Amino acid sequence: MKAYAAPFEKFVNLADARLGTKIISVTDDWFADANRLFQPTPAVWKEGVFDDNGKWMDGWESRRKRFEGYDSAVIRLGVPGSIKGVDIDTSFFTGNYPPSASLEACFLASGEPDETTQWVEVLSAVELQGNSHHYHEINNDQAFSHLRFNIYPDGGVARLRVYGVPFRDWSSVGDNEQVDLAAALNGGRALACSDEHFGRMSNILNPGRGVNMGDGWETARRRTPGNDWVIVALGHPGEIEKIIVDTLHFKGNYPDTCSIQGAFVKGGTDSQIETQSLFWRELLPAQKLEMHAEHTFAEQIKALGPITHIRLNVFPDGGVSRLRVLGKVSK
């Protein structure tokens, strides 16, 4: 099982470019485009690479400030949500990182922030070091749609990860509307898995199809009896009608078969839910998988009524690019 630097890293990265996160405005990104903050891949160093403005850096970098003030970037999150923690990553910024940074947030049902917007400080100014990750827990259950990332007074940051729980207004979903209850954009969250040696479990809930093997969940080769698995909390309770298991890009390393269990869980911690999952009812019996293919199951699904969590079992190991769990919302 992967070791996380902070417990909140298991939550969805609301500031992931793959979810649609982007810069709305920025005071200065002369040296490096601020939208690089949201790339899902770790920052890289390119030795000897320069562009018209100077050394190419994988992140956001502003000019050296020669007057009072500080730099800031206004960000629209790909999906609104409550924030559990952040990682301000200054990888490869050594003599050019900001000494400190802070984070503000707001929620707008539509439109973009303006001069009348009321911002809430979710992370007061914290000290930064060069070439380092800075993990900070945030306890705020309010949903936010936009962030204002402030760096004092200037400099460069490689990545900004904002981990939290996506928010969706489920009252707007029709009674007969079929939605992907496991999608990250709908609040689905990967809680735990047996192993994620080659790819994070949360990748399987991202929108679209995977761009490569690294954009999926892949386990190490199993050398002991048993099988690998991942547990997903659905964004909303629902009755499941269709399941899609996508092995795109996985050719010599896809699972032989898969099955899915489901349950309606009331309360409990992630670790307690992990233990309970052994005894959940069968939602989808074992199904043969093929390499590099989308597998759709409907008639094979058992009627369990409303469920809140599923457990995808893969036999014996391997990689899955995406998992879709479609059904009707239980109200």
UniProtKB/Swiss-Prot annotation:
SUPFAM superfamilies: Galactose-binding domain-like (SSF49785)
Disulfide bonds: none
Keywords tagged on the record: Hydrolase, Purine metabolism
GO term, biological process aspect, one: purine nucleobase metabolic process
EC number: 3.5.3.4
Protein name: Probable allantoicase
Enzyme class: hydrolase
UniProt keyword Protein transport, yes or no: no
Pathway: Nitrogen metabolism; (S)-allantoin degradation; (S)-ureidoglycolate from allantoate (aminidohydrolase route): step 1/1
Reaction equation(s) it catalyzes: allantoate + H2O = (S)-ureidoglycolate + urea
GO molecular function terms noted in the UniProt entry: allantoicase activity
Gene symbol of the encoding locus: alc
Family: Belongs to the allantoicase family.
Record Gene3D superfamilies: Galactose-binding domain-like
InterPro entries hit by this protein: Allantoicase, Allantoicase_dom, Galactose-bd-like_sf
Pfam families tied to this protein: Allantoicase
Keyword presence, Transcription: no
